[in-house]
């Protein structure tokens, strides 16, 4: 039987990939990678791009193209068999990556290229790729004695395993709780769309009634709209104690020991490499200079936002008391009364807006924005093999009708699909040895409500923002003009700059001129009426300071957890969180809350000692967008400048340089505070 993963393909053959194909394909690809490394090194000096970097980029690309669909399926179509196969490949990949990072001969070959005459003949992107490779050798412990190198490899392998275990615990804990409500009176206040979804969930399980789960499209409407306080509390407890030692499934999928070991190993790894803490190691590949700069940035922002956050909460408490006679707001009351207050102040709710954002309008509106700013057109293809019938596939063409890249769009929440929204690369742009150009392909994944009862999928405005955000990442990947592996698209972009294109794209969701075609009632097609539009814009910064403070809580918690770790004390996870809450949070959290246990961003994603990146990039994005506000939000020349200077440059140059080229100066904090309506 042939292995579809080992048969060359331009797009992954999703319907043919079976769990039993995974390990043999990855093993074979790794064997080829090792052979290519040995053969390139054996070539001997003088080394050049052609005899060293290019051949390795090509085998690496094959490995990536085999592993990418596997890892993607593990996220969007998880099954016990696939999970097992995926887990078997993790140690193999980790071991290979350590082997490469500590390959003395390969390191010498790169140093020879860096110090030899050939370096001068490389273009900017190639030089950056070589410099990054040398930096990564240092960060893989190339200079360490053999014992320490061995320990580095053990730690890296164990961390990869632990991250996966953490992620599985969160997924299992999320899927491990649900509640069937048989009396609709218990769901009073819930919008029609949420009831229909809960009913469909129950029917899918052949049950009568309404099935509630901890997936966001099910959880949020209960917290926001359900009049039943006991049910809100029950769901809040289940959600905020997922994968922990507390709550309805206490101890069942507990991430406490996983986090403790992750933090201990990260610290040991950082120290092995000569860093004071993992925070220093994290910043070795980021835009921010040192931990102090990050802490100052976060603390300064907290100082500016805190007074307004306190005011927002005080107003909410006063409102709940005056209108509903509520003496004490519990954590599971905040979203509920906030929605009521928002209605009261602006007479607008997410649900009122939903009919104006049917999927087809939101998606075609997004494409229209991209066409106006960058001259890029999206065309759908229906002949592509996908992992689920609901997945769509599009190609992007520029004004010269050149294919620039393509992407899969997977919008709805499903069982066995991890929550959240993300962009991932399927194929990276790369110039091949034979001169051909491999075009980029992306995955865009969201978890929105699916169409029910013959209506199209109707999005909330927040979901439209999420769609624009992920598409911003997608454009960064697909519109790259760099064809050097390792620095094209999002590759090699420092983590605190990678959110710039995504947060930047969100701005158009608030522009009346853009909303005119992003919105359209699913029955009549009429765009958002002026009156609703004005209310929506007025409500834009409702509780903005509370939102920023929540992000600061996450950012400071993550950063201080890594920066202040002391081996003799171990991980002070809940203590650190409590301290930071005192400093920045205005909404008190219950002592049994276990937010860290499901904070996948930092324990199973790429955001360790890096969650601050969201706010850091927010500053860049707001400042970049302010140039559009000055020159016109659909100014094609401004759009071209952003495309030429930032989007298309990938990781080929330092982000600060690219930003200054577009903006003419360094970023300033003011635009961001203004965007959030914070008088700092």
Short names for language-model regions:
Residues 78, 122, 133-137, 250-251, ...:
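Aromatic/His-enriched, Gly/Pro-containing loop or helix-boundary segments
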């Amino acid at each position: 039987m042939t292995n579809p993963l080992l048969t060359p393909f331009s797009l992954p053959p999703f319907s043919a990939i079976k769990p039993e194909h995974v390990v043999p394909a990855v093993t074979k690809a790794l064997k080829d990678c090792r052979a290519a490394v040995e053969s390139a090194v054996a070539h001997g000096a003088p080394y050049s791009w052609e005899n060293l970097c290019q051949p390795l980029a090509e085998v690496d690309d094959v490995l990536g193209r085999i592993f990418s669909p596997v890892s993607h399926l593990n996220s969007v179509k998880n099954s016990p068999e696939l999970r097992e196969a995926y887990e078997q490949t993790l140690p193999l990949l980790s071991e290979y990556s350590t082997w490469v990072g500590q390959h003395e001969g390969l390191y010498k070959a790169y140093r020879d290229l860096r110090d030899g005459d050939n370096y001068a003949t490389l273009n900017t992107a190639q030089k950056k790729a070589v410099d990054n490779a040398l930096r990564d050798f240092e960060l893989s412990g190339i200079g360490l004695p053999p014992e320490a190198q061995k320990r580095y490899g053990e730690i890296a392998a164990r961390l990869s395993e632990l991250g996966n275990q953490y992620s599985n615990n969160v997924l299992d804990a999320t899927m491990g709780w649900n509640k069937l409500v048989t009396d609709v009176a218990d769901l009073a206040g819930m919008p029609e769309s949420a009831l229909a979804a809960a009913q469909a969930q129950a029917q899918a399980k052949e049950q009568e009634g309404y099935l509630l789960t901890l997936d966001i499209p099910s959880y949020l409407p209960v917290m926001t709209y359900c009049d039943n306080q006991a049910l809100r509390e029950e769901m809040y407890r289940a959600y905020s104690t997922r994968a922990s030692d507390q709550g309805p499934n206490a101890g069942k999928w507990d991430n406490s020991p996983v986090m403790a070991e992750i933090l201990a190993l990260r610290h040991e790894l950082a120290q092995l490499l000569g860093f004071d803490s993992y925070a220093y190691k994290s910043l070795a590949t980021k835009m921010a200079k040192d931990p102090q700069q990050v802490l100052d940035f976060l603390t300064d922002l907290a100082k500016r936002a805190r007074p307004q956050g306190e005011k927002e909460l005080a107003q909410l408490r006063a409102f709940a008391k005056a209108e509903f006679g509520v003496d004490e707001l519990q954590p599971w009351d905040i979203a509920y009364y906030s929605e009521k207050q928002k209605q009261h102040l602006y007479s607008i709710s997410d649900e009122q807006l939903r009919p104006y954002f049917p999927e087809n309008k939101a998606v075609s509106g997004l494409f229209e924005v991209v066409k106006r700013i960058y001259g890029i057109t999206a065309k759908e293809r229906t002949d592509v093999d996908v992992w689920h019938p609901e997945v769509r596939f599009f190609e992007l063409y520029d004004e010269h009708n050149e294919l620039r890249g393509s992407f899969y769009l997977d919008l709805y929440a499903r069982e066995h699909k991890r929550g959240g929204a993300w962009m991932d690369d399927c194929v990276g742009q790369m110039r091949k040895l034979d001169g051909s150009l491999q075009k980029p392909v992306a995955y865009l994944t969201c978890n929105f409500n699916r169409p029910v009862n013959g209506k199209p999928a109707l999005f909330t405005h927040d979901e439209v923002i999420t769609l624009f955000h992920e598409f911003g990442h997608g454009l960064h990947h697909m519109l790259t003009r760099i064809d050097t592996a390792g620095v094209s698209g999002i590759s090699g972009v420092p983590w605190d700059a990678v959110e710039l294109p995504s947060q930047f794209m969100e701005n158009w969701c608030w522009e009346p001129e853009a909303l005119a075609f992003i919105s359209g009632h699913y029955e009549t097609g009429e765009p958002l009426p002026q009156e609703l539009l004005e209310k929506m814009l007025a409500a834009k910064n409702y509780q903005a300071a509370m939102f920023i403070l929540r992000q600061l809580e996450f950012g400071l918690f993550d950063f201080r957890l890594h920066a202040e770790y002391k081996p003799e004390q171990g991980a002070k996870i809940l203590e650190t969180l409590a301290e930071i809450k005192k400093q920045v949070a205005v909404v008190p959290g219950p002592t049994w809350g276990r937010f860290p246990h499901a904070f996948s961003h930092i324990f199973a994603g790429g955001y360790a000692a890096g969650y601050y990146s969201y706010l850091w990039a927010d500053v860049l994005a707001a400042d970049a967008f302010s140039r559009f506000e000055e020159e016109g939000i659909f100014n094609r020349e401004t759009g071209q400048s952003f495309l030429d200077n930032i989007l298309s440059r990938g990781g080929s140059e330092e982000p600060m340089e690219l930003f200054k080229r577009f903006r003419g100066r360094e970023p300033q904090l003011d635009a961001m505070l203004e965007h959030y309506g914070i008088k700092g």
